[in-house]
Amino acid sequence: AAIQAGRAGAKTLLVERGAQLGGTTTTGGVSFPGLFDAWGKQVIAGIGWELVKESVELDGGTLPNFARVPQRHWQNQVLTNQFLYALLAEEKCTKAGVEIAYYEFPQAVTKTESGWTVNCVGFGTRRRVNCKQIIDCTGGAEVVGMVGFSRLREEERQPGSYLYRLGDGHEPGRTRLNRLYVHGADSTNSR
C-alpha cells in the first residue's frame, strides 16, 4: 500500500514496528507466499507479485508453472529468499518517495477535522503525524481498534506455521526451506 501511494504521488510515511519490511514473509519467516493462481492461470498480480517475482529472479530461482493445476494448492507457492524480499521492498519504497520509520508503532489515533493525528513511539523517539488517510497493515488491526471500530475474530482461525530443520545448520533462503504446518494450532494472542 505504501509503495502504491508513493508511486501515485502521495506523501507517505510507513510506520514499521520491526527492523525490516515484509511482515510474515520476512520477519515471520514464512517465505513461500501464495497463492497467485487459480484454475490453471495467474489471477493475482500487483506490487506484492512484483516483489515476489523480482526476489525469485534475483536469487536465481524459478517460478511455478501456473498453467499446471497441482493436486495440492501449496505446490504452487513461490519459494522466495526473504532477505532479498525485504531489501527489494525497502528499495521500492525509497524509489517511490516513501519515508520509513523503523522500530516505531502507533500509540494513539485521533480523528481531526482534516483527517487523523497519529502519535507514534519508538526507542527514544516520539512523533506526531497529521494525515488524511491511514492504512492499517498491523496484522491485528491495531489502528482499527484504536479508532474504536470493532474487529472480527472468527471461531476457527488460521493456524500458525512452525518452521524448523533437524540436522545440518540452518541456511536461510529459498533453496533450504523446510516447512511443517501444525493444523489446528491456537493462533490467538494475548488480546
Question: Residue spans of the language-model regions?
Answer:
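N-terminal Rossmann-like FAD-binding beta1-loop-alpha1 element of flavoenzymes
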Residues: 1-13
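Conserved N-terminal/central alpha/beta ligand/cofactor-binding core
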Residues: 10-11, 16-108, 112, 152, ...
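Conserved beta-strand-loop-beta-strand element in the redox core of flavoprotein oxidoreductases
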Residues: 110-128
